[in-house]
């Protein structure tokens, strides 16, 4: 697991994620228009990857095909600002990103007591192609949670990894349809 990444690694990761996230429910929520999703994913990762890497919130697989982020919900921001923000603002999808983020923050504040340190685990990649890499990154995040004493909170709009996460010791704390969408949201915790 790498906490930092050079420009070449970020570029390779972004290229792979732009492809994988086309059919990911999170990006389908963020950008419902399939024809625009690739462009949106490119803008999203251009904006976020470098920021996550600088804050040591981004962890990349050796193949650069999958990544996870560990973000404290207290660090969530509800605006895009700074480098590479304008294209994302103009994409027309900011509202969806922020609605999802606020919903996650609200659910986590109910599932995990306020006084507990926590990190939101988000997985970027294709479980069908890179399952072992994803599980490897998750296991390293689990160890980090144990070592540093925080609750690891996995939030997903896909059921693809829920069973695997349960087998590793995650527990479902919340599972419901996401607002009035076609997506089913699951929030799981580890090291609670």
List each language-model region with its residue ranges.
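Conserved beta-strand-loop-alpha-helix junction that forms the acyl-donor binding cleft
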Residues: 123-129, 153-163
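Conserved catalytic-core motifs of GNAT/GCN5-like acyltransferases
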Residues: 171-187
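Active-site rim helix/loop that mediates acceptor-substrate recognition in acyltransferases
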Residues: 34-57
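Conserved acyl-donor/pantetheine-binding loop and adjacent beta-alpha core of acyl/acetyltransferases
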Residues: 66-128, 144, 179
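Short hydrophobic/aromatic beta-strand element in the GNAT-like acyltransferase core
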Residues: 55-60, 67, 120, 185-187
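Conserved N-terminal entry element of GNAT/NAT acetyltransferase domains
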Residues: 1-12
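Conserved GNAT acetyl-CoA-binding A-motif
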Residues: 118-120, 145-157
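Conserved acetyl-CoA-binding loop-helix of GNAT-fold acetyltransferases
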Residues: 128-143
């Amino acid at each position: 697991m790498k906490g930092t990444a050079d420009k070449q690694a970020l570029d390779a990761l972004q290229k792979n994620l732009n492809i994988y996230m086309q059919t990911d429910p999170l990006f389908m929520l963020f950008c419902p228009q399939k024809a625009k999703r690739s462009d949106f994913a490119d803008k999203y990762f251009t904006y976020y990857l470098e920021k996550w890497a600088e804050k040591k919130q981004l962890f990349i697989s050796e193949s650069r095909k999958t990544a996870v982020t560990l973000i404290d919900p207290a660090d969530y921001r509800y605006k895009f600002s700074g480098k590479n923000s304008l294209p994302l603002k103009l994409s027309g999808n900011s509202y969806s990103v922020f609605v999802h983020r606020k919903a996650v923050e609200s659910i986590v504040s109910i599932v995990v007591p306020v006084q507990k340190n926590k990190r939101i685990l988000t997985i970027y990649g294709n479980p069908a192609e890179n399952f072992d890499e994803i599980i490897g990154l998750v296991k390293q995040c689990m160890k980090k949670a144990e070592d540093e004493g925080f609750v690891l909170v996995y939030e997903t709009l896909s059921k693809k990894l829920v069973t695997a996460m349960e087998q590793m010791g995650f527990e479902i704390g919340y599972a419901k349809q996401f607002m009035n969408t076609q997506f089913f949201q699951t929030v799981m915790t580890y090291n609670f």
